[in-house]
Amino acid sequence: MAMSIAARSACCGVAAPRSSTVRVAAARPAVRPSLRTAGQKAAPSRGVATKAVNELAMIAGEAEFIAGTALTMVGMTLVGLAIGFVLLRVESLVEEGKI
């Protein structure tokens, strides 16, 4: 013989359950149906490709500035090397006593 919920709560000292109209967190589905599952492919994103093209165009527009800066740095390096070798030659002449 099965006891009713009211009789069971009365004999055991347990409060009667709340009305079934009250929503609780556990009653909600665990996963929203709008989320992708593992088997579905993502929709192609065009925003990233557009940003990449824009970035490439901006860099291409700065090519003259980048090339000029690179040539300046190469020139400064070569001048520094030339000065260094001249100083080495002067040092060797001083050690030999020719200067």
From Swiss-Prot:
Matches recorded under InterPro entries: PetM_cyt_b6/f_cplx_su7 (IPR012595)
- Quote a single Gene Ontology cellular component term: chloroplast thylakoid membrane
Q: Where in the cell is it found?
A: Plastid, Chloroplast thylakoid membrane
Main location class: plastid
Query: In terms of domain of life, where is this protein from?
Result: Eukaryota
For side Lumenal, which residue ranges? Answer: 61-67
A single Pfam family, by name?
A: PetM
**The keyword Cell division is annotated on this UniProt entry:** no
Where does the transit peptide start and end?
1-60
- Look up keyword Thylakoid and say if it applies: yes
Q: Which residues lie on this side of the membrane: Stromal?
A: 89-99
Provide this UniProt record's keywords sorted from A to Z.
Answer: Chloroplast, Electron transport, Membrane, Plastid, Respiratory chain, Thylakoid, Transit peptide, Transmembrane, Transmembrane helix, Transport
Q: How does it sit in the membrane?
A: Single-pass membrane protein
Coiled-coil ranges per the record?
none
Could you list the residue ranges that cross the membrane?
68-88
Family note: Belongs to the PetM family.
Its subunit composition reads:
The 4 large subunits of the cytochrome b6-f complex are cytochrome b6, subunit IV (17 kDa polypeptide, PetD), cytochrome f and the Rieske protein, while the 4 small subunits are PetG, PetL, PetM and PetN. The complex functions as a dimer.
What does the protein in this record do? Component of the cytochrome b6-f complex, which mediates electron transfer between photosystem II (PSII) and photosystem I (PSI), cyclic electron flow around PSI, and state transitions.
This chain belongs to the protein called Cytochrome b6-f complex subunit 7, chloroplastic
Species whose genome carries this gene: Chlamydomonas reinhardtii
Question: What lineage does the source organism belong to?
Answer: Eukaryota, Viridiplantae, Chlorophyta, core chlorophytes, Chlorophyceae
Query: Gene of origin?
Result: petM
